[in-house]
């Protein structure tokens, strides 16, 4: 009888863990802003999706051995999953993520879309270029230059560090 009860409890626990929602986007941002205040940093808020190839490239570049310590010294990188499809909606998407993206003018931007915020949540910059087009994951020399300029404006990165980031992001042509 005890074994039967144990199996039932385990089954129910497994069921709920499989159907658990991701964390609310506003709570994610709230935690990041709190951490940014404590550490005297800005927040790099990145909206992405599991199906988005450019999002994966952006994450890979930001997490490369050369770039990650530079970004982490100046920002709290924060990811919010939006625009998931099918079964991935429940599996990956953060509730209220799209509303948060819309709040920062990213409704029609495409992915990835990112915003640089100060520790109070004020927008310092975003992924729109001078022509109001989303850079997304910068890859061309022009896009990466614009990204570098935004980093320079919102961080204490040195010219040498900014060049390291530029070199890691610029798309190499074979």
Predicted regions and their residues:
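Bacterial Sec-dependent N-terminal signal peptides
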Residues: 1-23
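Thiol-based oxidoreductase modules, predominantly thioredoxin-like and allied folds used
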Residues: 23-26, 67-95
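A short beta-strand-turn-helix
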Residues: 25-43
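Extracellular/periplasmic catalytic domains that process cell-envelope and extracellular macromolecules
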Residues: 37-38, 69-72, 106-110
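Short active-site neighborhood of thiol/selenol oxidoreductases, capturing the structured segment around
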Residues: 39-53, 77
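C-type cytochrome heme c attachment motif
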Residues: 50-57, 112-115
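Non-catalytic, surface beta->alpha helical segment in thiol-disulfide oxidoreductase systems
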Residues: 102-161
């Amino acid at each position: 009888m005890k074994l039967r009860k144990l199996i039932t409890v385990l089954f129910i626990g497994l069921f709920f863990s499989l159907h658990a929602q991701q964390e609310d986007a506003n709570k994610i941002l709230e935690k990041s802003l709190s951490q940014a205040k404590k550490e005297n940093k800005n927040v790099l808020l990145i909206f992405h999706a599991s199906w988005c190839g450019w999002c994966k490239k952006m994450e890979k570049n930001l997490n490369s051995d050369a770039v990650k310590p530079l970004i982490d010294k100046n920002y709290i990188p924060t990811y919010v999953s939006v625009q998931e499809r099918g079964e991935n909606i429940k599996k990956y998407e953060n509730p209220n993520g799209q509303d948060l993206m819309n709040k920062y003018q990213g409704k029609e931007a495409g992915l990835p879309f990112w915003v640089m915020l100060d520790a109070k949540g004020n927008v310092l910059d975003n992924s729109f270029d001078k022509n109001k087009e989303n850079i997304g994951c910068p890859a061309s020399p022009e896009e990466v230059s614009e990204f570098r300029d935004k980093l320079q404006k919102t961080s204490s990165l040195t010219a040498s560090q900014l060049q390291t980031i530029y070199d890691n992001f610029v798309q190499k042509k074979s």
